[in-house]
């Protein structure tokens, strides 16, 4: 039986659509949809990753990190680090060691609307 579900496209609610859009563009994402039909919505993509950001009337969460930890796997953690630096995004780095034979690095940052962004070093 073929899989019924073939992709997931999360939508993040934000107060400042322009700042959030610019943040992801500076990291190398591109706009996959913007239009007059949905003026408070922008879809962004990079490779096989796609998600939306939407200005939501009444969005009042001052702690969106309590709602969502936004984690992306990246093929090149050094390039991800460089993009954050070039974009002027403050970040921290963490070395994870779940076991003796398994280590990887995480970069932690905040989006303009307060989401916790994690970039995880990984393999294909």
Question: In which residue ranges do the predicted regions lie?
Answer:
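N-terminal beta-strand motif that seeds the catalytic metal site of vicinal oxygen chelate
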Residues: 1-19, 68-70, 120-124
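Helix N-cap motif at beta-to-alpha junctions
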Residues: 16-17, 74-78
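Short amphipathic alpha-helices within nucleic acid-binding modules
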Residues: 23, 78-83
């Amino acid at each position: 039986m073929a899989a019924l579900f073939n992709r997931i496209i999360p939508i993040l609610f934000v107060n400042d659509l322009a700042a959030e859009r610019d943040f992801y563009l500076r990291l190398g994402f591109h706009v996959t949809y913007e239009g007059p039909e949905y003026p408070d919505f922008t879809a962004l993509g990079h490779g096989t990753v796609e998600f939306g950001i939407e200005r939501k009337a009444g969005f009042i969460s001052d702690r969106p990190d309590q709602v969502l930890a936004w984690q992306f796997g990246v093929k090149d953690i050094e390039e991800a680090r460089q993009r954050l630096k070039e974009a002027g995004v403050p970040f921290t780095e963490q070395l994870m060691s779940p076991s003796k034979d398994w280590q990887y690095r995480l970069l932690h940052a905040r989006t303009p609307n307060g989401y916790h962004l994690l970039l995880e070093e990984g393999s294909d």
